């Protein structure tokens, strides 16, 4: 199977590339920083480039995994880049619709798309109500959601907090002097390791399972419990901070 991984240089993309089964013919893309990855072909590619002819890309692959994310330092800049991504993915979907070969599409996004759910367990058929960074990412994802709503072959994987080397965890919990307890610390934290998420992506590719999908969790706990675990390991003191919206 010929697979294209858009965003092989990112935190999640690198792990997906590393965990690729040997029987897949994998091509990974990067924008600026070429990753050091073995066994895969690497191509420089800016998916936001309006001149990209997606039809030439689509016809070469049996599956396309989108692990790239439109980033920005502020909400306005993220929204602007996400609008560009929306345009790019709209053209991508149009190329898929017009192609004789219909590659299976897998896109990796976050469970923050569901917003604040309190004690409620999120289900795959729940409506999105994005908060924080996810408000921007939802703009980019919209053409893929619409494609799925039309009954087409696409898997939207909504991952919770992804933990691993290069994730948010060292910055928030290891590099700071104190371990934060956010608000009353009773918010649920659902965690998945980046390696287990990558393995789930490949299982999805092999099964060609469409729909909104939730990977199996590595761990689930209250945020205060997570902070206490880090405290036990690092001996750093905890500190309560306000909730950032």
Question: What residue spans do the PLM features occupy?
Answer:
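Glycine/proline-rich active-site loop of Rossmann-fold NAD(P)-dependent oxidoreductases
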Residues: 138, 151-152, 162-174, 203-214, ...
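Mid/C-terminal beta-alpha module of Rossmann-like enzyme folds, strongest
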Residues: 200-245
């Amino acid at each position: 199977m010929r697979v294209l991984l858009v965003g092989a240089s990112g935190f999640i993309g690198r792990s997906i590339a590393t965990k690729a089964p040997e029987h897949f013919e994998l091509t990974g893309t990067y924008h600026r920083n070429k990753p050091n990855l073995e066994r895969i072909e690497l191509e420089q590619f800016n998916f936001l480039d309006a001149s990209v002819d997606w039809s030439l890309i689509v016809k070469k692959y049996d599956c396309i995994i989108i692990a790239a994310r439109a980033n920005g330092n502020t909400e306005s800049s993220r929204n602007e880049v996400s609008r560009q991504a929306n345009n790019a993915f709209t053209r991508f979907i149009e190329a898929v619709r017009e192609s004789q070969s219909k590659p299976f599409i897998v896109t990796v996004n976050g469970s923050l798309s569901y917003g604040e759910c309190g004690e409620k367990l999120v289900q795959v058929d729940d409506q999105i109500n994005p908060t924080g960074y996810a408000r921007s990412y939802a703009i980019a994802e919209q053409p893929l959601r619409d494609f799925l709503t039309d009954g087409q072959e696409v898997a939207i994987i909504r991952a919770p907090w992804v933990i691993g080397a290069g994730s948010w965890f060292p910055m928030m919990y290891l590099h700071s002097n104190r371990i934060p307890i956010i608000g009353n610390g009773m918010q649920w934290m659902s965690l998945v390791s980046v390696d287990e998420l990558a393995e789930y992506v490949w299982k999805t590719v092999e099964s060609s399972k469409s729909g909104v999908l939730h990977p199996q969790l590595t761990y689930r706990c209250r945020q205060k419990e997570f902070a206490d675990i880090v405290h036990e390991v690092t001996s750093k003191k905890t500190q309560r901070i306000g909730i950032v919206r």
